A protein has these predicted regions:
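Feature captures hydrophobic
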Residues: 1-97
């Protein structure tokens, strides 16, 4: 799945936290913004309540079950900036993929 395909899938399933802006920052691969304030998922950068930084490859590994999110966090492969509770709530939202 490409980043654009992922953003479209999340958008079609309303996969955001109401009233919250959460940015998935894939470094040089770009970003996906789960914008609960605007009720949409985009590939546009901007200010966020929570930013999750992870490489695109590690993200793919997590989404395909080859890498556990908590393990990635403990190994420093996944970093969270801002409101940590939003990151915790995303587990259920991202299960919609």
């Amino acid at each position: 799945m490409t980043k654009s395909e992922m953003a479209a899938a999340l958008n079609s399933k309303s996969a955001w936290l109401p009233g919250k802006r959460v940015k998935l920052d894939f470094g040089s691969e770009g970003v996906v913004m789960l914008d609960g304030a605007a009720s949409q998922v985009t590939e546009e950068d901007g200010a966020a309540d929570t930013t999750i930084k992870v490489s695109w490859q590690d993200w793919q590994d997590m989404s395909e079950g080859r890498l556990d999110g908590m393990t990635a966090f403990m190994q420093g492969k996944l970093k969270v900036e801002g409101d940590m509770s939003n990151a915790m709530q995303l587990q259920g939202v991202l299960a919609k993929l």
